[in-house]
Amino acid sequence: MSDNPAILTLAADKNYLRYFKKYQIPALTNLGTGFGMGAIITTFVLGLSALDGNNYAPAALVGNLGAVIGSIISTRLMLRFTRRSFGADAMSQGDGGVPLARDYRVVRQGSVASRFLEAMLDGGKVGVQMGIDIVPGVLVICTFVMMLSGGPADGARYTGVAYEGIGLLPAIGEKLEFILRPLFGLQSPQSIAVPITALGSSGASLSLISRLVGEKLANAHDIAVFTAMCMCMSGYLSTHVAMMSALGYSRLTGKAILSHSVGGLCAGIAAHLIYSLIALIF
C-alpha cells in the first residue's frame, strides 16, 4: 500500500522466497504494483471534500474494490505466462541456482549488533538503488504526459505558466469518447489525462485530479474510477522494468506490462460498473 517497489525488499529476502514456487516470483511485481500508493491515493481522495464539500468516501471505497479486482486479473494473467515458462513444480532458487527449502532458514552471521547494522545498511542500499532505477522513468513519462495534456493558459497564446502543453490528450479523449464513456463513464474528455499520467506516476496524477475537481470537470463517479486506475496502474511503466530487473526476470517485462495494462483497464471498468450499480440502487 506504500509504493510498488516496496515488495522488492521482501523479494530480496530468501526466507520469504522459500514459500513461493519459481513461476510465482515474477508475478510479485504485478501484485505489488496493484496496490502501490494505495494509502496515499485513498487519503488524498478523502481530502478532496475540502474543495467542494462533497463526501468522497464511498467513491474511495469503490475505487479500492476496483483496484483489488484489477490486481487479481493482472496477477492471474502474469501467472499464466510464467507457468508456461517455468512449469508449475519448480521451487524458487537462491544464490547459485540452489532451490530454497521451506524447512531451512537463512541466518546472517555475527552477533546481534552486527546483524542489526548489516540489515540496516542493506535496507538503505536497496532503497537508494530503487530510487535510482525508478526516478528516470517517472520523470520522462510524467513530463511527456504533461506536455500532451494542457493547452495555452488563456486559450489563445502561450504565456509560460505551469501546465501548458499542446492539448493532444484531451483531443484524443474527445475522439474516443464513444468508447471511453461506456467503459469508464468519465464526465470530461480531459479526464483521460489522469489514467495516462498514472502509467508513469500515480502521485503526479493526483494533482490532475484536484484540478479537475476544482474546475467541476470530475464528479464522485469519476473519482471512484480515478482511484481504481491510479492504484492499480500506479506508475507501472516507470517501475516494472526496474522491478523485473531486480527480481532477475527482465525477459518477462513485456508480459508483466501487458498483464498489468489489462488489469488497470479492468480496474477502471469494475469501479465504473460498481459505482453505477450502487447509484442505481440507492
Predicted features along the sequence, with ranges:
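Alpha-helical transmembrane segments of integral membrane proteins, especially early/N-terminal helices
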Residues: 24-33, 97-102, 155, 186-191
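Hydrophobic mid-bilayer segments of alpha-helices in multi-pass membrane transport proteins
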Residues: 62-74, 90-104, 134-144
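Intrinsically disordered, low-complexity non-transmembrane regions of multi-pass membrane transporters
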Residues: 79-125
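Transmembrane helix-loop junctions in multipass membrane proteins, especially transporters and channels
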Residues: 51, 79-87, 150-155, 276-281
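Juxtamembrane non-transmembrane "cap" segments at the membrane-aqueous interface
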Residues: 91-103, 162-166, 195, 226-231
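Membrane-embedded helical hairpins/re-entrant loop segments and their flanking transmembrane helices
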Residues: 1, 176-188, 210-221
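C-terminal transmembrane helix pair
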Residues: 4-73, 198, 202-282
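Transmembrane helical segments that form the transport core of multi-pass membrane transport proteins
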Residues: 108-202
